[in-house]
Swiss-Prot record:
An example Gene Ontology biological process: enzyme-directed rRNA pseudouridine synthesis
Protein name, as recorded: Ribosomal large subunit pseudouridine synthase C
GO molecular function, one term: 23S rRNA pseudouridine(955/2504/2580) synthase activity
Gene: rluC
Keyword ATP-binding on entry: no
Length: 326
């Protein structure tokens, strides 16, 4: 088949790849996303669905977990030049990701993720943090997200550079030995006695594909600890420490407590959001500012902090000024 003018061949011919011990344990879709850099997620799923990708000569589903010594057949892949445009040209923020790396060694990378960038491509997004990092680190054999952050939430994001590091960090998350702290600017005066919110959360998917979470007895047990950092006239800066890790947990728990987060398009308060917009806020005020965990290789306790972005600092400064002038 002739190559079209506006097409780029990512994989010239059929490749038979043997899975190493380090590559084992990951899903085939994630493996292909890393191997076929620049190929849209939709195309990866298409070649999996059509059976063009095979493992040990058999068809597999996207969620298939690779085993050591599996033999993966990867077909030739063509994408349009437009689709293959370097990620950094698609969004200026992504080219700034390099400057947002807080810590990096041979095992892991810790990023201060900007607001507005998804951690993964998909859902109508052509790229995410992980795809951008694979572009910034073309020689990295392994780059996988350890956990997730909502697109509009900024702050600390852990990325494993080795399968062994990913396993160790996932185990720490399961054992609840990872301490994660967030800063959230919420409506009104947070009550001093409200130190823990325990409310089960149920995830729903709307017909549009949008995910929405609500408090429900049918939901999963969920717990967030809160402490007051600073009070303002009509808002409070709180520290939120999730004990469980449910989707939108902090956002729904603050709303449930009667204090929604500033500029939360799903769970927020219109009047409060208007006040915040007038001060210059353009994004959800939720930031993962601190994490503590054991280094997967050395066992040393690491504590990493991510500074607030300039916009958040400016908003807090404006709120302090308002408070002192009244």
């Amino acid at each position: 088949m002739n190559q079209k003018k506006d097409e780029k061949v990512i994989n010239q011919a059929v490749k038979m790849l043997t899975i190493s011990e380090d590559e084992a344990g990951q899903r085939i879709d994630n493996y292909l996303l890393a191997k076929l850099k620049g190929v849209p997620k939709s195309l990866i799923y298409r070649i999996l669905r059509k059976g063009e990708v095979r493992v040990n000569k058999g068809r597999i589903k996207p969620e298939y977990k690779l085993q050591a010594n599996d033999i993966v057949r990867v077909p030739p892949v063509r994408v349009s030049e437009k689709e293959h445009a370097p990620i950094s040209t698609k969004l200026n923020k992504v080219s700034q990701l390099e400057k947002q790396i807080l810590f990096e060694d041979e095992c892991l990378l810790v990023l201060n993720k900007p607001s507005g960038i998804a951690v993964h491509g998909g859902s109508g997004l052509s790229f995410g943090v992980i795809e951008a990092l694979r572009t910034l680190r073309p020689d990295a054999r392994f780059l996988e997200l350890v956990h997730r952050l909502d697109r509009d939430t900024s702050g600390i994001l852990l990325v494993a550079k080795k399968r062994s590091a990913l396993r160790s960090l996932h185990e720490q998350l399961r054992e609840k030995t990872v301490q994660k702290d967030y800063l959230a600017l919420v409506r009104g005066q947070w009550q001093s006695h409200c130190k823990v919110v325990k409310a089960p959360l149920l995830k729903n998917e709307l017909s549009s594909g949008e995910r929405i979470v609500r408090v429900s007895e049918q939901g999963k047990p969920s717990e967030t600890r809160f402490s007051i950092e600073e009070r303002y006239e009509y808002a409070t800066l709180v520290k939120a420490s999730p004990v469980t890790g449910r989707t939108h947990q902090i956002r729904v728990h603050t709303q449930y407590a009667g204090h929604p987060i500033a500029l939360d398009d799903k769970y927020g308060d219109k009047h409060f959001d208007e006040q915040m917009t007038q001060l210059g806020l353009t994004r959800l005020f939720l930031h993962a500012f601190s994490i503590r965990f054991e280094h997967p290789k050395t066992g040393e306790t690491l504590r990493i902090n991510a500074p607030l972005d300039p916009e958040m600092k400016k908003i807090l400064g404006a709120l302090r000024e308002q408070k002192s002038s009244n």
